[in-house]
Amino acid sequence: MDDGTVTNETRLGAVRDIQFAIDSLGIDDDMLVIAGDNVLDFSLVRFIEYARAKGTSCIMRFFEPSEQCLRKCGVVEVSSEDLVLGMEEKPSEPRSHWCCPPFYYYTRKDASLISAGITAGCGTDAPGSYIAWLSTLPPVHAMEMPGHRYDIGNLESYHTVCEQYDGIQPTATK
């Protein structure tokens, strides 16, 4: 998809990019949204099955012990039943140690609410902004990530991933 943006100053932002894809492709269904600068060592089959079993929009989460790292990601608070209680992008004071990478499953209903979220001021730059807004209209569930993800943020991290990545691990497929 190409929205025609040629500069950082005129880009739509992650949330508006999702809405652009919905509008351009006429999507009226459940959606799996994953940031393109991530590589996974596990299959997404289990995540999709989890979301369908819950019947709600879902996110993934992983435990991050470092508060410094938490200040650079989306941080999610969850109940003992995996319900999202709140989410904040790049908090100065993280309220949990659960990091939420940009892997989202939106139900058809919740995907249709993205434009309403934008209008309500959910934020459009960070992909987690919409989930943060959506979690105020429960339920949204959070599944613990069954493997590792590699975030390719720059050339150095790309080279690191090239050295370390060993493909999707069979034990992480389900």
Regions found by a protein language model. Name each.
Residues 1-78:
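Conserved beta-loop-beta/alpha segment of the NTase-like Rossmann-fold superfamily
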Residues 48-52, 83-151, 155-174:
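Catalytic-core segments of class I nucleotidyltransferases/pyrophosphorylases
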